[in-house]
Design a protein with these regions (language model features):
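Acidic, low-complexity, intrinsically disordered interaction modules
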Residues: 21-95
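Short helix/turn-capping signatures at newly exposed starts of structured segments
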Residues: 1-7, 90-92, 99
């Protein structure tokens, strides 16, 4: 699943499309979609992935302060797989986006293999 395909899929889920509008300046529309989603919940098989994001770009546009918590856990055992809360410089965003996408794709692949 590509990045664009993932977004198209997420935007078909009503619960994921109710983020409030916030006045934050981003470089691109894609960046805005990726980094601000309020509360987003996506169910995949027995796993639930929750993304919570609040972001602010400073007036000087040099730093991107992001508090992003990613919680992935098995709905049956409630075992938590991953959490993270970080502050990033804007120069780190592209690398982090790539890492998040790769991690999500690997998780999806691993889950699918479990059900083959």
């Amino acid at each position: 699943m590509t990045y664009d395909e993932c977004f198209k899929y997420l935007h078909t889920i009503p619960e994921l499309c109710s983020s409030p509008v916030i006045d934050v300046r981003y470089n691109t529309d894609e960046e805005q979609q990726f980094f601000y989603h309020g509360n987003r919940i996506c169910y995949m098989l027995n796993y639930k992935i929750i993304f919570y994001k609040w972001g602010y770009v400073s007036n000087c546009d040099r730093y991107f302060l992001v508090s992003w918590t990613s919680i992935i856990y098995d709905q049956l055992t409630k075992d938590q797989i991953d959490t993270s809360i970080k502050v990033y410089k804007k120069s780190e965003i592209e690398h982090i986006k790539y890492e998040k996408i790769q991690k999500a794709q690997k998780l999806i692949t691993d889950i699918k293999q479990d059900f083959v």
